[in-house]
């Protein structure tokens, strides 16, 4: 596992984004872990988060693209922070763009925020955690309306590696339904691999009991890597 992935996993723990315990998802599943990206709340945290996204994008897709598109609302700061990080660490000036959920009737009435998207642009979509394809289903028509746009791929922070309504993961369903590549900074398999049985800040984050609960969850809801 790459070093930046290990650092990102620990970063999520430090920020309180990655939690372990007893949770219930929106779909009603009982889960022993939860990822809440709403806990990235400071400038320093967003700067680091942008760095991890930038490295994941560079590894998966390279930098031969024009625009980072972050769907409203959580994708807005992600697109900004990551575009800044790509400029700083890879010396590549990438445009950022997001959409409005509400239509304005005054001033700038366009649906897009940030850079416009032009015919022929190559776009990478950036999101937080994808557990269903709802957001991408709203995003693709917005991009298509801008012209002949080439969607290079989708990047999320964590791939939960669990089934949606069918037998495949949400990211795999997106790949098949929309014909685009997907990637994540880390997968939950990598999270467990890095944290299981190892002390971090004086505490073992994933002990044997929690590991058994995670294994049982994936026995019921998991997908193949």
UniProtKB/Swiss-Prot annotation:
It catalyses: orotidine 5'-phosphate + diphosphate = orotate + 5-phospho-alpha-D-ribose 1-diphosphate. Orotate binds at residues 131, 160. Its cofactor is Mg(2+). Signal peptide: none annotated. It is an enzyme of class 2 (transferase). Pathway: Pyrimidine metabolism; UMP biosynthesis via de novo pathway; UMP from orotate: step 1/2. GO terms for molecular function: magnesium ion binding; orotate phosphoribosyltransferase activity. InterPro entries: OPRT, Or_phspho_trans_dom, PRibTrfase_dom, PRTase-like. GO terms for cellular component: cytoplasm. GO terms for biological process: 'de novo' pyrimidine nucleobase biosynthetic process; 'de novo' UMP biosynthetic process; pyrimidine ribonucleoside biosynthetic process. 5-phospho-alpha-D-ribose 1-diphosphate binds at residues 26, 73-74, 100-101, 104, 106, 127-135. Homodimer. Belongs to the purine/pyrimidine phosphoribosyltransferase family. PyrE subfamily. Catalyzes the transfer of a ribosyl phosphate group from 5-phosphoribose 1-diphosphate to orotate, leading to the formation of orotidine monophosphate (OMP). This is Orotate phosphoribosyltransferase. It comes from Lachnoclostridium phytofermentans (strain ATCC 700394 / DSM 18823 / ISDg) (Clostridium phytofermentans). The gene is pyrE.
């Amino acid at each position: 596992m790459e070093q930046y992935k290990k650092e990102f996993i620990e970063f999520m723990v430090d920020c309180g984004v990655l939690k372990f315990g007893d949770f219930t998802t929106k779909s009603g599943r009982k889960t022993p872990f939860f990822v809440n990206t709403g806990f990235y709340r400071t400038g320093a945290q967003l700067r680091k988060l942008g760095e991890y996204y930038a490295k994941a994008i560079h590894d998966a897709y390279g930098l031969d693209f024009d625009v980072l598109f972050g769907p409203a609302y959580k994708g807005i700061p992600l697109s900004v922070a990551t575009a800044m990080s790509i400029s700083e660490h890879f010396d590549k000036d990438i445009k950022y763009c997001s959409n409005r959920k509400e239509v304005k009737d005054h001033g700038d009435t366009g649906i897009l925020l940030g850079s416009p998207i032009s015919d022929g642009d190559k776009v990478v979509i950036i999101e937080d955690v994808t557990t269903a394809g709802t957001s991408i289903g709203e995003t693709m028509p917005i991009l298509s309306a801008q012209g002949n746009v080439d969607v290079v791929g989708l990047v999320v922070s964590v791939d939960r590696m669990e089934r949606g309504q069918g037998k495949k993961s949400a990211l795999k369903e997106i790949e098949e339904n929309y014909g685009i590549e997907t990637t994540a900074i880390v997968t939950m398999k990598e999270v467990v691999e890095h944290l299981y049985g190892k002390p971090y800040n004086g505490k073992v984050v994933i002990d044997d009991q929690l590991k058994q609960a995670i294994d049982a969850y994936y026995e019921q809801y998991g997908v193949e890597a």
